[in-house]
Amino acid sequence: MSTDTLMFTATEHGQSMHAKVKEFIETQIEPIEAQFWADCHAQNPDGDWTKWHWPEKYESLRKQAREAGLWNLFLPDDKLGAGLSVTDYAPIAELTGRSLLAPYVFNCNAPDSGNMELLWRYGSDEQQDKWLTPILEGKTRSVFCMTEPDVASSDATNMQATAVVDGDEIIINGSKWWSSGLGDPAVDVLIVMAYTPDENKDRHHQHSMVLVPAKTAGVKIERMLKVFGDYDAPHGHGEVSFNNVRVPVNNFIGGPGMGFEIAQGRLGPGRIHHCMRCIGAAEKSLELAVKRGMQRTAFGKPLLQLGGNFERIADARIKIDQARLLTLYAAQKMDAQGTKAALTEISAIKVVAPTVLQEVVDMAIQIHGGMGVCQDTMLPAFFAQARALRLADGPDEVHKTMIAKLELKRHGFSRSSSKPVKS
């Protein structure tokens, strides 16, 4: 990302933090990243997630980052985070997206960043002390359980998992999958979204978020799921079942029926972070493509001078810059007017950024040839990230439908009527 872009998006404080993060990534993370992931694969057998662990010799990196004040930067709180706005943090998220390791080092990787912000905004004092503080300190990890295996999760009201009040307890039953981070040995708590029936409330106030300690009786990790053949150890994406799981009634976050409202509050900034990380990954992919294409020759010329590759590089540059500017606009609007006012822009970037990343990575893979699909570059991981993100957190089709509905409303129409709606 150029400093010119920073000039019209970030405050002086944001620019300063951006410079520090950039230097840390370039000097401390990038030189050891390839070895880190090689060690992860060597030390974490795919077939047995119960033995997964993070290579201990790299923990000093996290300690260095924390001591340098590069810790929990996504959190806008001055004491718990760095006091950065969404707009300030967005370019930093882009930097972390260039690396597969950086989000872990800075304690800002998903789903923890979203879960921490959720607990910071909506958690009670007791919940924050018990669950938020250890995650903020990097001592524990968390999981967000929303998607279910037996229903179309593009309609969140389809949820079959239930969270029913029984006296001073909540009883949870059901299954969730694609619960990211479930294989991490440091996971201590799951945030579970489930159906809480209440005939006195509308359909969008009958779902709740519940804090479930990972070792509660009745919680069972069924399996880890491969993404394009990779388990993503030691993080993992798993399927988990809840069989008559009982937790205290004060484990509701924000109270029963608040699930959808909290989800929107969690997912708004989170989508900015996801999309800027996508843009960072796209930048890295383009950089790799240019270097590979100019250093390799065929028929007496650099690869980039053959077969329309100049145009492919130009298209990538244009798409990345367009995606970045749209995402920064969404961030600025969210800061200035709130998440609700930026719903169109937030849905738009959720469609655009992963798609741009997928297209740029595909181009970079083609330039690299066989090397592009093996473990010698980040490209396969970036491709998996892009393709999965077009489904995670709402598929493209859901976001496009949202954009269209908001556009009709802006012009005075409803989805079902061809006549303007009277205001």
Predicted regions and their residues:
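Short, surface-exposed charged micro-motifs
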Residues: 160-162
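Short Gly/Pro-enriched turn/cap motifs at secondary-structure boundaries
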Residues: 150-154, 181-185, 200-201, 228-236
